[in-house]
């Protein structure tokens, strides 16, 4: 039986949160550092389940690194080439999508004999579009269980060239190709077919790649020209900014029950798209101030909105919670890719929002929410999804208790989330 956690009603939130490092940036930075030409010192690294899977893989590949959990740092000796495992290997990557997709592309570059696998949910998350793109460049990849889904067997062979990849399901497929193609034998042209989702995550990838010495030219995110036979050049030191998706919970708490909450580690200079979450809160009526590396939110009366949130899919989940405390209807649009995340988030959010008294309409790629007349105590199923657990913790701001089942799923990206939340709460 999974453990549950009951949160008592919170009367006020006030204080400062120093954000943990971004998961998306940490895993990319670990991978690029490992393949770079010398030693890289990473600061403000995130230590969580998802990043541990990447570190475990680096260790198996023979990469030498020294991590300090107290200083949130990691020093990595680059191997100056794509990651490689000389013997037949099976790698278990849990439900770490960023790690799985990027490693699938990198292991396609060398002669390997690797089975990439994951947990039950990972085996339900489609990977066909990435596999097809890698196969176009010569990769030998086969499905070992269900067609179009992990686990996959990788035997190398990817040399680049003309690649077509769908942008419809996940931007991680394109990110993986952008990380791998500079190391391929041939120059590559990557053409994105179908509309690209979560575009800001591509900006994160391009930003990281440029910090490691590689520039990629693109035409409006539809065509990317990549020179092959390049090397990743270590920046010597790289500081990972705070996790903008994780910031959303604390900023939302302030908008609902502030006080004033300041999050540090992200701000005007952030490379993450999810900082735009603060602008959405502002549209809903919250008081927002941006600094270079901080954001402050204060409570004001909130109103519902109708908005396309394709660019901030993770933080958009938090807006679904803010909607419960807002006047009128909220519609979150263009979020089909919620369905292929850690769980089918559209279905899961609909089910759990209804439990606490909200009126909800679930569309194919949107969710419509009317706030409860009265909040109802509920036991929230978290679906082993860290973001659902973190979102629904905010129901305690309603004046009633809330119970979260399997609350430790937050370990995926934010192991001390509940302690951090408690640090700004008055009861």
Curated annotation (Swiss-Prot):
It comes from the Bacteria. SUPFAM superfamilies: EPT/RTPC-like. PROSITE patterns: EPSP_SYNTHASE_1, EPSP_SYNTHASE_2. InterPro entries: Enolpyruvate_Tfrase_dom, Enolpyruvate_Tfrase_sf, EPSP_synthase, EPSP_synthase_CS, RNA3'P_cycl/enolpyr_Trfase_a/b. GO terms for biological process: amino acid biosynthetic process; aromatic amino acid family biosynthetic process; chorismate biosynthetic process. It catalyses: 3-phosphoshikimate + phosphoenolpyruvate = 5-O-(1-carboxyvinyl)-3-phosphoshikimate + phosphate. GO terms for molecular function: 3-phosphoshikimate 1-carboxyvinyltransferase activity. Phosphoenolpyruvate binds at residues 23, 97, 125, 172, 345, 387, 412. GO terms for cellular component: cytoplasm. Transmembrane segments: none annotated. The active site is at residue 314. Its EC number is 2.5.1.19. 3-phosphoshikimate binds at residues 23-24, 28, 170-172, 198, 314, 337, 341. It is found in: Cytoplasm. Keywords: Amino-acid biosynthesis, Aromatic amino acid biosynthesis, Cytoplasm, Transferase. PANTHER family: AROM/DEHYDROQUINATE SYNTHASE, PENTAFUNCTIONAL AROM POLYPEPTIDE. Monomer. Catalyzes the transfer of the enolpyruvyl moiety of phosphoenolpyruvate (PEP) to the 5-hydroxyl of shikimate-3-phosphate (S3P) to produce enolpyruvyl shikimate-3-phosphate and inorganic phosphate. This is 3-phosphoshikimate 1-carboxyvinyltransferase. It comes from Buchnera aphidicola subsp. Baizongia pistaciae (strain Bp). The lineage of its organism: Bacteria, Pseudomonadati, Pseudomonadota, Gammaproteobacteria, Enterobacterales.
């Amino acid at each position: 039986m999974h453990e549950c956690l009951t949160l008592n009603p919170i009367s006020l939130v006030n204080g400062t949160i120093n954000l943990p490092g971004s998961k998306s940036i940490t895993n990319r930075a670990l991978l690029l550092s490992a393949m770079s030409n010398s030693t890289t010192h990473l600061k403000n690294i995130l230590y969580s389940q998802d990043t541990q899977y990447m570190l475990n893989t680096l260790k198996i590949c023979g990469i030498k690194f020294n991590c300090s959990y107290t200083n949130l740092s990691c020093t990595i000796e680059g191997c100056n080439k794509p990651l490689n495992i000389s013997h037949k290997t099976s790698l278990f990557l849990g439900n770490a999508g960023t790690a799985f997709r990027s490693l699938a592309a990198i292991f396609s570059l060398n002669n390997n004999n690797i089975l990439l696998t994951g947990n039950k949910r990972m085996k339900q998350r489609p990977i066909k579009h990435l596999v097809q793109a890698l196969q176009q460049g010569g990769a030998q990849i086969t499905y070992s269980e269900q067609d179009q889904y992990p686990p996959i067997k990788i035997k190398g062979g990817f040399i680049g060239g003309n690649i077509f990849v769908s942008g419809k399901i996940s931007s991680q497929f394109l990110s993986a190709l952008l990380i791998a193609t500079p190391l391929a034998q041939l120059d590559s042209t990557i053409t994105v077919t179908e509309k690209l989702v979560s575009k800001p995550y591509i900006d994160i990838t391009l930003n990281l790649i440029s910090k490691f010495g590689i520039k990629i030219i693109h035409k409006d995110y539809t065509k990317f020209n990549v020179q092959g036979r390049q090397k990743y050049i270590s920046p010597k030191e790289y500081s990972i900014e705070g996790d903008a998706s994780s910031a959303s919970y604390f900023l939302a708490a302030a908008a609902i029950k502030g006080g004033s909450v300041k999050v540090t580690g992200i701000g005007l200079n952030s490379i993450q798209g999810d900082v735009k979450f603060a602008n959405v809160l502002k549209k809903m009526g919250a008081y927002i101030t941006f600094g270079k590396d901080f954001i402050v939110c204060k409570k004001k009366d909130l109103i519902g909105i109708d908005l396309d949130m394709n660019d901030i899919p993770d933080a958009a989940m938090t807006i679904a919670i803010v909607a419960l405390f807002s006047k009128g209807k909220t519609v979150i649009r263009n979020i089909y890719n919620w369905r292929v995340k850690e769980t089918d988030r559209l279905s899961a959010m609909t089910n759990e929002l209804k439990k606490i008294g909200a009126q909800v309409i679930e569309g194919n790629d949107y969710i419509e929410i009317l706030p409860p007349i009265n909040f109802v105590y509920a036991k929230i199923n978290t679906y082993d999804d860290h973001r659902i657990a973190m979102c629904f913790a905010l129901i305690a701001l309603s004046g009633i208790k809330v119970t979260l089942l399997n609350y430790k799923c937050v370990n995926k990206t934010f192991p001390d989330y509940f302690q951090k939340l408690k640090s700004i709460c008055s009861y």
